[in-house]
Amino acid sequence: KSIYDNLMGYLNYIEDYYFQILKESEYVEYPSPHESLFQNNYTKLREDIIFCKKECDNWYKMVQDKTKERVCLNHGNVSLKHIIRNSKSYLISWDKNHFDTPIADLIDFYHNEWNNLEFSGILETYFSKCSLSDEEKKLFFINISIPLKVEFGENEYINTIRVTDLFDYIHKTELLIGPYYSIKNKEQ
């Protein structure tokens, strides 16, 4: 219940946050490039938030009667910088390790490296080697689908890059999880 409440609370917060940005930019007579880009793509952001809320409700229906939750030791800050490759690969820098759901590190890794790696093969390999329940997969997909929070500053160039990254993140995540929601995949 607390995971559901936290997710829904954050989704409501991020929805209000971006709605306020949209409202403020609508009053500008000549919108800047980042404001114009944001206005033109706001419906995509809104659709993503609606999808996340719907999936949160579906996930909660799946787990509301469960009394046990699976936990494991998580690294806490997985990124490419913390992987040493040799004949075997090693994960270093365990300073932030903690016990959490098995998907916590996968979520962090996606948030840290979404723009640097093609994750479809990584997920396929991960799901084949590590057994995740349907509930855990759904929770993972919800968490990575939540839009990133963009902070704006004084530099228009950087603001435009941040808005572009926001919508690139949404698009790339949509392409990544889409096959797992296809009719063919649901039948298997």
Regions found by a protein language model. Give the residues of each.
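Conserved ATP-binding subdomain of kinase catalytic cores across diverse folds
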Residues: 1-26
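Amphipathic alpha-helix face/heptad-repeat signature
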Residues: 7-10, 41, 45, 143
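An alpha-helical support segment within catalytic cores of ATP-dependent transferases
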Residues: 18-75, 186
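Active-site acidic catalytic loop and adjacent metal/ATP-binding pocket
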Residues: 54-104
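Short acidic/histidine-centered micro-motifs embedded in hydrophobic/aromatic stretches
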Residues: 62, 142-143
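Active-site activation/catalytic loop segments of kinase-like enzymes and analogous catalytic loops
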Residues: 99-133, 144-169
